[in-house]
Swiss-Prot record:
Cysteine-cysteine disulfides: C46-C60, C53-C64, C59-C69
A Pfam family it matches: Conotoxin
Taxonomy of the source species: Eukaryota, Metazoa, Spiralia, Lophotrochozoa, Mollusca
UniProt-recorded name of the protein: Gamma-conotoxin-like TxMEKL-053
GO molecular-function terms, A-Z: ion channel inhibitor activity; toxin activity
Amino acid sequence: MEKLTILLLVAAVLMSTQALNQEQHQRAKINLLSKRKPPAERWWECGIWFSRCTKDSECCSNSCDQTYCELMPFPPDW
């Protein structure tokens, strides 16, 4: 009877450990997926034409004149 009790306790500990590991793995997977945004959401994170900016990456056109987003980047010889 003692051996059966010990066996049941060991089985319970193993099952709870496995369940805990699965839960943490699933939570990490959800966190990883939630960091990604669809392209439509990423588009609106950039500034449209004539929005305030300080660097090119803040503008949808990828062209900032240090004050406002430009409609499009101009050639360097302008």
